From Swiss-Prot:
This is Ulvan lyase NLR42. It comes from the Bacteria. Substrate binds at residues 164, 218-223, 288-291. It comes from Nonlabens ulvanivorans (Persicivirga ulvanivorans). Residues 1-47 form the signal peptide.
Amino acid sequence: MVFFKDLFIFKSLIKGSLYSGHMKKKLLNYLPLFALMLFTVSMMAQTAPDEDTNSSIACPSSGVFQNNTTRDVDIANPDNVGTVDDRTCYADYYETSVYGETWGAYNITFNSNHWDAPNTLQPRIERSLSRSQETGVGSYARFTGTLRILEVGNTGTFGSTGSYLMQAKGKHTGGGGSNDPAICLYLARPVYGPDANGNQVQVSFDIWREQINFRGGSGAAGRTEVFLRNVLKDEIIDIELEVGFRQDPNDPNLKIHYSDAIIGGQVFNWNIPEPERGRESGIRYGVYRVKGGRAQMRWANTTYQKVEVVDNSTIPAADIYRIKNVETGEYLTSSGSSIIASTSGTGSDKEWEIISAGSGSSYVNIDSQVRGIIRFTGGSSNPGLVSTNFSPPNTDTDKVWTVIDNNDGTVSFETRNLGRFLYHDTNNMITHSANIDDRSKWNLESTTLSVDSQQIASVGVYPNPTVDGFTISLDNISAEKVQIFNLLGMLVYEQKTNESSIHIDNMDNFDSGMYIISVTANDNKVYQTKLIVN
């Protein structure tokens, strides 16, 4: 902190009572020398008053920090907000009092993760914060705090050097990546300079944003690093990170999923790719990753706030289906790269989204909740299906399907416009075939519709199927809004109401096919049922 003290004295000389024309002239004469002195002092490493200077980075042989039964290892009434995730046997979270503040201390060392199998994942002491689990415009998670970086990991290789200070988190639809993927991580890499004895030590840190290129992205192909700024060792830095959803200024019908950071007064905003796939917004902070040496960071003045706004622009979760074959009663299932049939409809590997293949496209992608979209291969001689890692929307000609409504409550999926259909064959293989029978027909079971039959029973529609019009009855629901969506999730009807029933006789927006009626109540609960238009 010598640098900041000297800078304060210099400013006092310029602005204080000693300031005069004569003094100004003398100061200007010495300014280059003084500036050099400041630069030299600033780059000369100072040991922070609460820095861990232990020469050993090994976990204590006593096992005092092993904590084999829990990762939530905390002190009573911690000053820092959030729940601890402690995966290091080197140290536990503790607090120090320096510079007039209470600081949470986060220290980890190379090979100190004893939890994850061991050392398959990097050591960390982080704090997790409850996530904003809605995706409507105005939903966000916001963290603020004050940070001092004292040391970060170093391997001598650029890519593996550095430690993370915070990260934006958030799950997404359509599969791909880990079960709890990072959206972007904020990484500190060391800059070296001399200490008082001339030894090369960490004197400052370059801050980088490691951002995904696509949902679930990891590694060199899946992420990009962007340099943000440099901060000095032990410099007191104000931090703000907000992750959430805002309206796209270029299209009011679209939204942006963002991760906006302010680091030491400098703004670094970033829009997350594939915002329509985002399901939540979360934040973790502390210290994470050390592939060589030790990492230690100090956090103070931490706060957290979240806002959750329901997204009513599309069917809430109703566009996630179990796809059941009419002939066999078995469910379409993603099993690794294969598509198989299962007698059970339980599990996310039987859950699918039917998503438009692109703006203006009449085709759809069939997207697994645990993997990616279905690709069809071969023709009549060697037909096959592959569960890919590709995400929707995708217009590749071997990954697009036409949804055909059979006007009996079932649908068929045609491979593009090739006259071949998703098919459960007699050999129990899921394939595509030119045969048109009940093995090419499928029931779409909405995961929302099948969860709570008591909710569904309170929404009625008659006549159903219909041709000329229909009535929606709302039994025991204090309704606020009625919406009707087609199978692609497009809104075709919306009406605010406080009545117990609605009659619709204008069918101009209703082509033949299946629809989902979604009723939002005053308490924000959503009730849904199916409608078939002939």
